């Protein structure tokens, strides 16, 4: 069964992106509280999709803005803050996924309830598929998982994924193929 994916960003993320884009006109990099209020919904939306676990999102958002506090002075263009925060979110999500996988290897992590990610009006069949996909994603290397989610769940174009992950375009394309192959195998056997 070939895996087909709607490459448009998820509706909730599109709403957040629209709000953030309209607010980008005046950005004060010295106002971290204002940056947090403006961009934390966007960072949380990206983190939720990458991690697949709501319980870790708040911690990741805080970590992203702690990194922002330390690194915001190096940002030259205030209009680039959203992309920079996305890049920090991706980097920290990859670290967190690697740590989670290590803990699962030694059975030090609890089972994840992926059904909580589904919208209230999601059918039982769709919830079951969501659980299967995220469980298959759990078996992937963290960076491969994140690249696949950026492309297929968040709808990011290749050039944006290259920028967000600091990988070459050929590496991103290879990891996308690897992820598709892995998901096809796992979902066919599930």
Question: Positions of the model-derived regions?
Answer:
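Internal acidic/polar
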Residues: 10-19, 103-126, 130
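Short helix-capping/turn signature of helix-turn-helix
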Residues: 13, 38-40, 50, 149-157, ...
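A short, charge-rich alpha-helical start-of-domain segment used by transcription regulators
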Residues: 21-45, 55, 69, 133-135, ...
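Sigma70-family region 2
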Residues: 24-25, 65-81, 99-101
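Structural recognition of an alpha-helix C-terminal capping motif at a helix-to-coil junction
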Residues: 59-66, 79-91
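Arg/Lys-rich amphipathic alpha helix in sigma70-family domain 2
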Residues: 73-76, 87-108, 126
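Short, Lys/Arg-enriched C-terminal cap helix and immediately downstream tail that follows
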Residues: 98, 140, 178-190
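Helix-turn-helix DNA-binding module
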Residues: 138, 142-146, 154-174, 181-182
């Amino acid at each position: 069964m070939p895996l087909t994916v709607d490459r448009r960003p998820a509706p909730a993320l599109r709403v957040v992106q629209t709000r953030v884009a309209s607010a980008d006109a005046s950005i004060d990099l010295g106002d971290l509280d204002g940056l947090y209020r403006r961009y934390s919904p966007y960072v949380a939306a990206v983190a939720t999709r990458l991690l697949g676990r709501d319980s870790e999102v708040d911690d990741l958002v805080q970590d992203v803005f702690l990194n922002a506090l330390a690194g915001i002075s190096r940002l030259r263009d205030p209009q680039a803050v959203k992309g920079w925060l996305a890049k920090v979110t991706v980097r920290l999500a990859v670290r967190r996924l690697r740590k989670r996988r290590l803990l699962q290897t030694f059975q030090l992590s609890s089972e994840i309830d992926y059904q909580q990610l589904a919208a209230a009006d999601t059918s039982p069949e769709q919830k079951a598929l969501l659980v299967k996909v995220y469980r298959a994603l759990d078996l992937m290397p963290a960076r491969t998982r994140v690249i696949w989610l950026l492309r297929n769940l968040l709808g990011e174009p290749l050039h944006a994924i290259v920028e967000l992950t600091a990988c070459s375009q050929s590496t991103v394309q290879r990891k996308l193929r690897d992820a598709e192959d892995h998901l096809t195998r796992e979902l066919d056997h599930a």
